């Protein structure tokens, strides 16, 4: 039984689903998708549970979220294993994901109070008060690259705000979604407050079309995000939060520490096997001896990376991609770059046939025409050379996306210029593109999404503001507006 609807585990009535080990192809999980009737039942359960949940004291909702965090800590080893197996990321990295899930509860509590709590402003004859109210029933669509952490970043703040939810994890990581839901169950969530529906595209389309929804929180590809935007067009009453991908540039300008710069580039491009939305896809390197030395060292160090199983010892830097099919798509993109005239610097290769273990690829694309402005979700890095910093910024902004952008340079003035001219939601200096602060907003512009539905600003998407002018008493003003006459006796 893989669905959790109205406080009960049940078997899906839709198509059969299974999850296999991306590296070894062994069966990890099997179940069935929710059919349309079960999606409707999940939304109806969330709608029925909303009034009571929204009216519960905030302290009650906080206590359940904190119990969930404690359960994550108690079950960290097992949840780490499940995430690592499903995604094929190394154990060390899966463990950091669970830690991020635990920390998200405290961060969300602080963000709720800071960004969406009550604010009172005194007035001469009363007070102005800002309060926030939950939207109602929200759908949460989770991605596969961080199947615990990223949906958690929507679920926790949404529940704290008083919303009820229907959660659809990625069909590529159903086991993680089920395992996390069982911890919420143990934390004591009332029936219907959080519901789980498994499934692929058909389930997602059925869920996003439900009239019971007051909003949808999505993390995933730009293609799916655009489809959801079209589907909800003409429904301004529904909140739609889209956190999508990026074709992210990393500029390298005369680094004074070659190995330090190479380390930042590898962390930016190849961590999580290149499956982070903030990963560097385009490396912009200044022409000259320093740039040549940097590139040569990058190719050398990246060539030493050996992807391996999640539980291999010693632990690898990279695991595999989410599936063998995903690895093949990266290789197809590589071949496309070659066919357009790209110069291979480091050729990617499968560690074993039929596996998702793929070594990094680096290809120079300077002067190559018609390079697709698409996010290749894997360990593939394109290189462009430039002559001056203005050209670098022009290249960096030459994308429909706008998620992350970074600069490796000892010169602060270069970063100041980039801050003014970059079109990206995250702009880092001498830090990995994949680095983000939990106390800062996360998101981008353009095809990367509608601004900041994640991290510190997630609370903004989970509640709407209510403004009030308040006074415990009232009386006839001494000075009246023109045309008002209160003279004579009071009318009986």
Curated annotation (Swiss-Prot):
Keywords: Arginine metabolism, NAD, Oxidoreductase
Stored SUPFAM superfamilies: ALDH-like
Residues forming the catalytic site: 243, 277
Reaction it catalyzes: N-succinyl-L-glutamate 5-semialdehyde + NAD(+) + H2O = N-succinyl-L-glutamate + NADH + 2 H(+)
Gene Ontology BP annotations: arginine catabolic process to glutamate; arginine catabolic process to succinate
EC assignment: 1.2.1.71
Residues annotated as binding NAD(+): 220-225
Pathway given in the UniProt record: Amino-acid degradation; L-arginine degradation via AST pathway; L-glutamate and succinate from L-arginine: step 4/5
Record has Thylakoid as a keyword: no
GO molecular function per UniProt: succinylglutamate-semialdehyde dehydrogenase activity
Function text: Catalyzes the NAD-dependent reduction of succinylglutamate semialdehyde into succinylglutamate.
Xref: HAMAP family: Aldedh_AstD (MF_01174)
The name this protein goes by in its record: N-succinylglutamate 5-semialdehyde dehydrogenase
Species, as recorded: Cronobacter sakazakii (strain ATCC BAA-894)
Gene: astD
């Amino acid at each position: 039984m893989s669905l959790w609807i109205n406080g009960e585990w049940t078997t899906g009535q839709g198509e059969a689903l299974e999850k296999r080990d991306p590296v070894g192809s062994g069966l990890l999980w099997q179940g069935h998708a929710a059919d349309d009737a079960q999606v409707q039942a999940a939304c109806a359960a969330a709608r029925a549970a909303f009034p009571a949940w929204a009216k519960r004291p905030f302290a009650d909702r906080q206590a359940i979220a904190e119990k969930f965090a404690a359960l994550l800590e108690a079950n960290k080893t097992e949840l780490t294993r499940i995430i690592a197996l499903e995604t094929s990321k190394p154990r060390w990295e899966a463990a950091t994901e669970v830690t991020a899930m635990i920390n998200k509860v405290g961060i969300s509590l602080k963000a709720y109070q800071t960004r969406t709590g009550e604010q009172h402003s005194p007035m001469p004859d009363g007070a102005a008060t800002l309060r926030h109210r939950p939207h109602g029933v929200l759908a949460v669509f989770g991605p596969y690259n961080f199947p615990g952490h990223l949906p958690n970043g929507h679920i926790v703040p949404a529940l704290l705000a008083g919303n009820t939810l229907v959660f659809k994890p990625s069909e590529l990581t159903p086991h993680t979604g089920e395992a996390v839901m069982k911890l919420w169950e143990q934390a004591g969530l009332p029936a219907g407050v959080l519901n789980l529906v498994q499934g692929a595209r058909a389930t997602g389309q059925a869920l996003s079309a439900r009239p019971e929804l007051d909003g949808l929180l999505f993390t995933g590809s730009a293609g799916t995000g655009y489809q959801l935007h079209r589907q909800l067009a003409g429904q301004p009453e529904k909140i739609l939060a889209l956190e999508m991908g990026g074709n992210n540039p990393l500029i390298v300008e005369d680094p004074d520490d070659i190995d330090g710069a190479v380390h930042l580039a590898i962390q930016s491009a190849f961590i999580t096997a290149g499956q982070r939305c903030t990963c560097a896809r385009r490396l912009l390197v200044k022409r000259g001896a320093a740039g040549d030395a940097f590139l040569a060292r990058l190719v050398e160090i990246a060539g030493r990376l050996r992807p391996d199983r999640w539980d291999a010892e010693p632990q690898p830097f990279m695991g595999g991609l989410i599936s063998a099919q995903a690895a093949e798509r990266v290789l197809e993109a590589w071949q496309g770059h070659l066919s357009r005239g790209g110069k291979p610097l480091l050729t990617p290769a499968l560690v074993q046939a039929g596996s998702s273990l793929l070594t990094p690829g680096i290809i120079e694309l300077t002067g190559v025409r018609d390079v697709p402005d698409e996010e290749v979700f894997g360990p593939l890095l394109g290189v462009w050379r430039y002559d001056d910093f203005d050209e670098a910024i022009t290249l960096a902004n030459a994308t429909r996306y706008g998620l992350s952008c970074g600069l490796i340079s000892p010169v602060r003035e270069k970063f100041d210029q980039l801050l003014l001219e970059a079109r990206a939601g995250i702009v880092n200096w001498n830090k990995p593109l994949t680095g983000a602060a939990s106390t800062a907003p996360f998101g981008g512009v353009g095809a990367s999404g509608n601004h900041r539905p994640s991290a510190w600003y997630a609370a903004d998407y989970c509640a709407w503001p209510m403004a009030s002018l308040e006074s415990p008493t009232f009386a006839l003003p001494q000075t009246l507006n023109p045309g008002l006459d209160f003279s004579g006796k009071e009318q009986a």
